[in-house]
């Protein structure tokens, strides 16, 4: 059975007297840094020039370049976008790591796929909250927390596991519970969830439903409401109580349709395709494609983004959200 670590079984001892450099001050960076600081940890911020630099200063942190922050720190937590971590690490972190330091991440992508290859004399661990940074911070301030995963890739000092747990406690995660994993497991399951279900799977399911109704002659506005807008109602129910809560809350007509028509849409071949997606993640095909496209200026990525931006469902959605000022402010400006 999975073991969960809580506040009462984890101490801050492994990080006593150590300085932590949080590299990045975006969604996760600001939450980690502020929570650690509020828990009494010694924190500095490492950033490149930009808006985040001033924001971190306004929040009361000592802010340095990435290399300067690394030189001061015992623990370096890298909270930058996946695609820039490798370059920043090689130029501004790696030259300044010392024996016995700890290198940390909130996602295992660059370590697992060897984009970043740390020296053998430093600890390498991850602490990955299962929620966005604003929620990590808000729940901490409210006295609760977002659960997290932790894992150790390299234990040079014999203390990497304790340091990782102390770090998890520092951001508040042990209030809710922390589950041990590996870089491999965290990375592959995270990518699979994004590609097959949460982002890729759901977006194509919604688009296909929209296209089916519009091609059958139904008004695009009604199609949007039925397959996209109402998705939030169902997801919220699922989030709060699982699929059982959805089926308890919807009409008998909807529940019966769930049972008889769901398997007609998500057929066994869909699961087989999911297995192929997982295989491409496991064998490194996806990571290589992503890394190579990044090196080429993200030509494929930006073209795919532009193609999706032009889909009819996006235009219809922009127009309909004008009727709903309570959500209009969440629209993304291009």
UniProtKB/Swiss-Prot annotation:
Keyword Amino-acid biosynthesis assigned: yes
UniProt keyword annotation of Oxidoreductase present: yes
The protein's Enzyme Commission number: 1.1.1.86
GO cellular-component term (any): cytosol
Molecular function via GO: ketol-acid reductoisomerase activity; magnesium ion binding; NADP binding
Cofactor binding notes: Binds 2 magnesium ions per subunit.
Cofactor: Mg(2+)
Pathway(s) served: Amino-acid biosynthesis; L-isoleucine biosynthesis; L-isoleucine from 2-oxobutanoate: step 2/4; Amino-acid biosynthesis; L-valine biosynthesis; L-valine from pyruvate: step 2/4
Leading EC class: oxidoreductase
Keywords attached to this entry: Amino-acid biosynthesis, Branched-chain amino acid biosynthesis, Magnesium, Metal-binding, NADP, Oxidoreductase
InterPro entries listed in its UniProt record: 6-PGluconate_DH-like_C_sf, KARI, KARI_C, KARI_N, KARI_prok, NAD(P)-bd_dom_sf
Pfam short name (any one): KARI_C
Location of the active site: 107
Binding residues annotated for Mg(2+) 1, in chain numbering: 190, 194
Location of the KARI N-terminal Rossmann domain: 2-181
All residue ranges annotated as the KARI C-terminal knotted domain in the record: 182-327
Residues reported in the UniProt entry to bind NADP(+): 25-28, 48, 52, 82-85, 133
Amino-acid positions noted as binding substrate in the UniProt annotation, renumbered to this chain: 251
Reaction(s) catalysed by this chain's protein: (2R)-2,3-dihydroxy-3-methylbutanoate + NADP(+) = (2S)-2-acetolactate + NADPH + H(+); (2R,3R)-2,3-dihydroxy-3-methylpentanoate + NADP(+) = (S)-2-ethyl-2-hydroxy-3-oxobutanoate + NADPH + H(+)
Signal sequence coordinates: none
PANTHER family, alphabetized: KETOL-ACID REDUCTOISOMERASE, MITOCHONDRIAL (PTHR21371:SF1)
Stated family: Belongs to the ketol-acid reductoisomerase family.
Record-given protein name: Ketol-acid reductoisomerase (NADP(+))
């Amino acid at each position: 059975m999975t073991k969960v670590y809580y506040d009462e079984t984890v101490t801050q001892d492994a990080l006593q007297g150590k300085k932590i450099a949080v590299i990045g001050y975006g969604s996760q960076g600001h939450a980690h840094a502020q929570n650690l600081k509020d828990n009494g940890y010694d924190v500095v911020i490492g950033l490149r020039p930009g808006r985040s630099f001033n924001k971190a200063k306004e929040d009361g942190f000592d802010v340095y370049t990435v290399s300067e922050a690394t030189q001061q720190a015992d623990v370096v937590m890298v909270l930058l976008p996946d695609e820039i971590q490798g370059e920043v690490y090689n130029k501004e972190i790696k030259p300044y790591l010392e024996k016995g330091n700890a290198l940390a991440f909130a996602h295992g992508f660059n370590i697992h796929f060897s984009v970043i290859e740390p020296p053998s004399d430093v600890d390498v661990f991850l602490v990955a909250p299962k929620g966005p940074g604003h929620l990590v911070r808000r729940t901490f301030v409210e006295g609760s927390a977002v659960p997290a995963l932790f894992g150790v890739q390299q234990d040079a000092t014999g203390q990497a596991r304790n340091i990782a747990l102390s770090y998890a406690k520092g951001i508040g995660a042990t209030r809710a519970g922390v589950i041990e994993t590996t870089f491999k497991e965290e990375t592959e399951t995270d990518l699979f969830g994004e590609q097959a279900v949460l982002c890729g799977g759901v977006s194509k399911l919604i688009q296909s439903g929209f296209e089916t109704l519009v091609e059958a002659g139904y008004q695009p506005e009604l199609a949007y409401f039925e397959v996209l807008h109402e998705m939030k109602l169902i997801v919220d129910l699922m989030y709060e109580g699982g699929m059982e809560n959805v089926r308890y809350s919807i009409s008998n007509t909807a529940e019966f349709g769930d049972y008889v028509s769901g398997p007609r849409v998500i057929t066994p071949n869909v699961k087989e395709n999911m297995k192929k997606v997982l295989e491409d993640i496991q064998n490194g095909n996806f990571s290589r494609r992503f890394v190579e496209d990044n090196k080429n200026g993200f030509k494929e990525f930006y073209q795919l983004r532009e193609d999706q931006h032009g889909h009819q469902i996006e235009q219809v959605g922009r127009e309909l959200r004008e009727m709903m000022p309570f959500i209009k402010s969440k629209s993304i400006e291009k």
